[in-house]
Amino acid sequence: MSNIQFGSQVYTWFMQGTGKGYDNKLDHMIKIAGEAGFTGIEPMVLEISESALGCGKYWLGDFCDAGRLKAALDEHHVKLAGLALVCAFDGDQLTPGEEEAVAFTINLLKQFPGAMLGTVTLPSGRKNDLQRRRLNVARNINEVSKRGTDAGLKCSYHPNSPPASLVRTQEDYDVVLSSLDPKVTGWTPDVGHIIRGGMDVIPTLNKWQHLVNHIHYKDFSGNGPEPWAQMGTGKLDFHQITEWLVSRNYEGWIICEDEAHVAVEDPDGVTRQNGQWCRENLHPIVA
């Protein structure tokens, strides 16, 4: 039996009103994730939540408090799979706001043994100094991961694929992933972002398999400016990807992060459907 667990990412709820719809409602997301059959949840620590969006601190709000967060998790029998720390990370050094967010995230995660410190690059544009900024991302991510590792945490970097993302293409991956320090930084492949960036999923997983310590699942339609599909209805072969994980004795989380258009209007319903789809299609593979 493999040691693979399934969790849910809060971005599915964040899309409604760009954070406004479910601001300070992490307890609700935890409840729905548990009802959907997921055993974990991955909230965000979004540095710009207050300054740019007018939402609660880090899009955690009251759940910045470890006691409040633990109580909500325990009530619904859901684990904290990790926190996704979202910052630009592209400066010559960490900004004061990034430093504050890093320290907060590490201190919170220390209260939840086994939860992953995920780092995510906030898309910041590709027009100026692309190579320097990509290398800055790798250096800053390694610095954050070293601090996390020194605090007893496991750490993993998650690239994404919006047009303004610094790490979205094969060339970007070759620069940044090859510059990660594997002693402290793993890689979270997001299979939807990989295909949107023009890459094939399995060859990309093969190339960087030594770094994989966390993974995100989202489906891809290829249509429109936000080319996502509800899980199981798009172009990705999640059976094959899950078999790839099992064959390599992967231990950790599969985090479902549905960004399909229908999820904007009904994140609860989509999360429940994702949970059912995983139970019917993927749980037998990892059993």
List each language-model region with its residue ranges.
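Histidine-acidic metal/acid-base catalytic patches
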Residues: 1-39, 74, 101-103, 113, ...
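Glycine-rich, proline-tolerant flexible connector loops at the mouths of alpha/beta enzymes
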Residues: 42-70, 124-125
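The substrate-binding groove and active-site-proximal loops of carbohydrate-active enzymes
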Residues: 56-60, 87-95, 192, 230
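Active-site acidic/histidine proton-transfer and metal-coordination neighborhood
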Residues: 31-34, 66-68, 72-82, 87-187, ...
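Residue-level marker of alpha-helix boundaries and capping positions
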Residues: 19-20, 59-60, 96, 134-135, ...
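Conserved residues at the C-terminal ends of beta-strands
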Residues: 44, 86, 120, 218, ...
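Short, conserved active-site loops that position catalytic residues or coordinate cofactors/metal ions
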Residues: 36, 41-50, 82-85
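Conserved radical SAM core fold
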Residues: 13, 47-50, 89-90, 122-127, ...
